[in-house]
Amino acid sequence: MVLATTEQIAGYEIIETLGIVLGNTVHSKHLGKDIAAAFKTLAGGEIRSYTELLTEARNIAIQRMIAEAEKLGADAIVGIKFGSSSVMQSAAEVLAYGTAVKIKKI
């Protein structure tokens, strides 16, 4: 599966647009790690536990988006974008979405 944030893929022609595909997940951190993160905000710097949380969530969202595209018979997903939102305290949703397409090498 070819993934692109652009609308076109160099060296390929889009021969069919199959529709929008998306993948999302909601993740939360363990209470103990959340308390440690709260103290980290006082000192400043990267909160690694949250960085890891969002990286894991983004990867899951991407895999779910790819699974949707594969069900449609897509070769690629173009125009990929990401969104995130706080669902509740200490829980974040990550959304990956794009357009599933069939492509042909030029």
From Swiss-Prot:
UniProt xrefs under Gene3D superfamilies: Hypothetical protein apc22750. Chain B
Family: Belongs to the UPF0145 family.
Superkingdom per UniProt: Bacteria
InterPro entries in alphabetical order: UPF0145_dom_sf (IPR035439), UPF0145_YbjQ-like (IPR002765)
Protein name: UPF0145 protein Tlet_1264
